C-alpha cells in the first residue's frame, strides 16, 4: 500500500462523509500486515474514533473480509468471535465501516472509517474504495 494511495482513500472517505452530512469522521488505512499507512481525524471527531477506525481496518486484513461481512459471521457463530477476540487481544471490531483494498484480487490493505452510525461509516468507506 503506497502512502499516496492511502491518503487519497482517506480524503475520499472524508469527502463522502461531508457529502452525506455525516458526523465528524476518522479514517485509517493499514497495509496487508495491519500497520498504519495513513490516518486522519476531522475536527470534532471524538477521541475514540481513530481507534475504532483502526480496529475496523485491522479486522479486515486479519480475517480477509470487510467488517460488514464480519458482523454477519459473528451473528452466525458467536463462539468463533469470542475465541478470535481473545486470540487477538480484543483487536477485532465487528462493526461495518472497514473495507479491504484489493488490486488484482490481492489484498493490499484496508480502510476503516468511524464517527457516525456503522452504516454511514460503511457507505463512506465503500465510496472511497469505489465499489
Task: Please describe what each predicted stretch is.
Residues 1-131:
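Flexible, solvent-exposed loop/hinge segments and secondary-structure transition points
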